[in-house]
């Protein structure tokens, strides 16, 4: 007969704070409710982002480069706010409350955007042929910004906790549930892609043919329904107690090491402080040895409690395990930095590539494809790549190499190569499009929009590899207690990629334009040299790839009993190159 403990999850509780009963809490039913709210979040955020540049240019009458930067700043802020959401979830609210609060904020943002696009007072008058267009007023732009950044705030809070709360529904100490958890992560990205697919097809079509206010209204109602369904699972969820922000631990280790910076390290690590010497979870490493000084025991490091027990002051003394956990986070940074450029190239797919599409012939018979819906090829590439990888590449790789698939670092490398190829394809197509534009006076150029498919497909396939590779890398190579933070760190690569795009657009616009020359990024892309901008990204991506390979070769996974769940092939070697 099984003990009562075998039917409960050791580190989880139910909604009343009791040990979580496996038969009554968690599992696929609750995970499905969580996946549902993520699908709606993707539907809303991507449905707005992929078609926003056309609204800003055609309705709000803003210049091309300004419109592109508004979109990338919006997306960048969305992912940057994941850090705020992760901090609140870890330190105060917990994942359940964080998801509930921030999903409500996102619903308010989409509702406000629906109103902003509906009321004539909140947008400039329509342009008539031959007349100068009146740009949006400061008040109209303020309303738009408030709506967008409410959505960004909601997205940031949601994304920081949604995958973690989903994994909380499975017990990683139960082999059966651990297998379900792995399947959950595999399907998590699939559901994200499905939400994006609905956004770039159904929602974008509604925006162009029915009205943006109706489309955004549907997003608002969908999120409201998803929130209600999510809350219906309150009694069935498994909850993990907040353990405090790992940011505090990082600062404690740094502060203790700085305090003892002039002290000499002992010859042997046995003289360094450890909470439980018999249960060291992470092997000591020689990298970043200056941080080891935080574990040197010195006078004044211990304080007496009221019971007379001596305990270490965490700002003066850290254990070897805590120091090694901080080292693990530091080791992630070079890989983190060299994946940012991918998301800069990704940003072009929802800004300038959509603008390119708006000038090209988009008809299939009598049906005219919305410019924003061209990103369907981007999403299709992701889904096809994931299917081919799961069904063909992984079995072949396992048979040939004896490994379950490409390592996380190998997948990231493949993603970087594909995105570079995608930008090269984009530059070549833009050269062709510009040559047609010079010889044509038509508003819609006599060139098929399907010439853009290769760039969407290559960057989309690249995302399938790099997103799953990054997620795997940042989760498996981070300390157990810092996985929410490491997920947030991963998502900041998306954020910074969008911000780098905005920065490059602004710099290129300023450097290449003069009083007599519109430069590379003209208000009308038919008069500029967008292809030069794409070639610039190809060069930057190539340089970044070389740096990435160096960083990947330098990276050494930390060995430990509990901190890192390693599989064959998680490392990176010269052979992997």
UniProtKB/Swiss-Prot annotation:
Tissue: Expressed in shoots, leaves, flowers and siliques. Expressed in leaf petiole.
Location in the cell: Membrane
GO cellular component assignments: membrane
One Pfam family it belongs to: PTR2
Record keywords: Membrane, Nitrate assimilation, Symport, Transmembrane, Transmembrane helix, Transport
Disruption phenotype: Wider leaves resulting from increased cell expansion. Lower nitrate content of the petiole and midrib.
GO molecular function per UniProt: symporter activity
Membrane topology: Multi-pass membrane protein
Family membership noted in the UniProt record: Belongs to the major facilitator superfamily. Proton-dependent oligopeptide transporter (POT/PTR) (TC 2.A.17) family.
Function statement: Low-affinity proton-dependent nitrate transporter. Not involved in dipeptides transport.
Protein name: Protein NRT1/ PTR FAMILY 6.2
Originating species: Arabidopsis thaliana (Mouse-ear cress)
């Amino acid at each position: 007969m099984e003990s009562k403990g075998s039917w409960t999850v050791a580190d989880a509780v139910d909604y009343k704070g009791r040990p979580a009963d496996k038969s009554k809490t968690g599992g696929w039913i609750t995970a499905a409710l969580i996946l549902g709210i993520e699908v709606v979040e993707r539907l809303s955020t991507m449905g707005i982002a992929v078609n926003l540049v056309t609204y800003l240019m055609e309705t709000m009458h803003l210049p091309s480069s300004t419109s592109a930067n508004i979109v990338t700043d919006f997306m960048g802020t969305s992912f940057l706010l994941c850090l705020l959401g992760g901090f609140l979830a870890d330190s105060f609210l917990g994942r359940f409350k964080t998801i509930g609060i921030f999903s409500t904020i996102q619903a308010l943002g989409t509702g406000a955007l629906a109103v902003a696009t509906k009321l004539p007072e909140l947008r400039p008058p329509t342009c008539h042929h031959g007349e100068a267009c009146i740009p949006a007023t400061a008040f109209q732009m303020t309303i738009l910004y408030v709506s967008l950044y409410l959505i960004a705030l909601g997205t940031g809070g949601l994304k920081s906790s949604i995958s973690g709360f989903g994994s909380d529904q499975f017990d990683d100490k139960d082999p059966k549930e651990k297998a379900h958890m792995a399947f959950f992560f595999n399907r998590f990205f699939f559901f994200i892609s499905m939400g994006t697919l609905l956004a770039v097809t159904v929602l974008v079509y509604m925006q162009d043919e029915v009205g943006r206010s109706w489309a955004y209204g549907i997003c608002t109602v969908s999120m409201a329904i998803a929130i209600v369904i999510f809350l219906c699972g309150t009694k069935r969820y498994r909850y993990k107690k907040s353990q405090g922000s790992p940011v505090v631990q990082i600062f404690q280790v740094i502060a203790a090491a700085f305090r003892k910076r002039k002290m000499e390290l002992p010859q042997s690590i046995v003289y360094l402080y450890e909470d439980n010497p018999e249960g060291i979870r992470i092997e000591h490493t020689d990298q970043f040895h200056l941080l080891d000084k935080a574990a040197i025991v010195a006078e004044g490091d211990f304080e007496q409690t009221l019971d007379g027990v001596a305990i270490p002051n965490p700002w003066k003394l850290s254990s070897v395990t805590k120091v090694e956990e901080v080292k693990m986070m530091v080791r992630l940074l070079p890989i983190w930095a060299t994946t940012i450029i991918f998301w800069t190239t990704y940003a072009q797919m929802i800004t300038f590539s959509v603008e390119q599409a708006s000038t090209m012939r988009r008809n299939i018979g009598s049906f005219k494809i919305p410019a924003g819906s061209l990103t369907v090829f981007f999403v299709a590439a992701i889904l096809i790549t994931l299917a081919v990888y799961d069904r063909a590449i992984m079995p072949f790789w396992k048979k040939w190499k004896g490994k379950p698939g490409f390592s996380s670092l190998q997948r990231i490398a493949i993603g970087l190569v594909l995105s570079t190829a995608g930008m090269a394809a984009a530059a070549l197509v833009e050269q062709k499009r510009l040559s047609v534009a010079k010889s044509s006076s038509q508003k819609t150029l006599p060139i098929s929009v399907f010439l853009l498919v290769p760039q969407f497909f290559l960057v989309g396939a690249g995302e399938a590899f790099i997103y799953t590779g990054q997620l795997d890398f940042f989760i498996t190579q981070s300390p157990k207690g810092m996985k929410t933070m490491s997920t947030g760190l991963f998502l900041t690569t998306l954020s910074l990629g969008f911000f780098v795009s905005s920065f490059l657009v602004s710099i290129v616009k300023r450097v290449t334009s003069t009083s007599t020359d519109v430069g590379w990024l003209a208000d009308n892309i038919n008069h500029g040299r967008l292809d030069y901008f794409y070639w610039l990204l190809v060069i930057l991506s190539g340089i970044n790839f070389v740096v990435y390979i160096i960083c990947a070769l330098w990276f050494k996974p930390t060995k430990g009993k509990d901190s890192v769940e390693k599989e064959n092939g998680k490392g990176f070697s010269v052979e992997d190159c």
